[in-house]
Amino acid sequence: MFQGATQLNLDSKGRIAIPARHRDALLERCEGKLVLTADADGCLLVYPQPEWQPIYDKLNKLSSFNARSRALQRLLIGHASVEVMDGAGRVLIPPTLRSYAALDKHVMLVGQGNKFELWDEARWQAQQEVALSFMQGDLPPELEGFSL
């Protein structure tokens, strides 16, 4: 499983180098095949291909008569791109996805268990501040009794 946040740089060709600690797991799990797609929070989601397939299958079964379902399909399936990690552990971020997430030179790769989020570094810092402000209020019911 993937965890931790790592600051990375996009190279001149729009690629990131996957941190060494994740490369072997990705090669073993999916032969370096990753699915990148847009997220509603303004970042990108990066899935090992086997983790993406059940999500794709569920999304594809949603009713095309429901406007929210169509919007979700357009966001996630419409932006999805299969990319393969090269021998140096680099992954191309397609221009359309770089534009969507406003990715510039400095990015953050954030492990989220079965996937990664890829953020523009400035957006990551801003959302971290928002997340910390949420913690000042009441916890949602599902987190009551949760302890670290």
Describe every region a protein language model picked out.
Residues F2-L44:
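A positional/architectural concept
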Residues A131-L148:
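Acidic/histidine-enriched, glycine/proline-rich intrinsically disordered or flexible terminal extensions
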Residues A25, P54-I55, W124-Q128:
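Short, charged/polar, Gly/Pro-enriched secondary-structure boundary elements
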Residues E28-C43, A80, A102-W119, R123, ...:
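A short beta-strand-loop micro-motif that forms or neighbors metal/cofactor-
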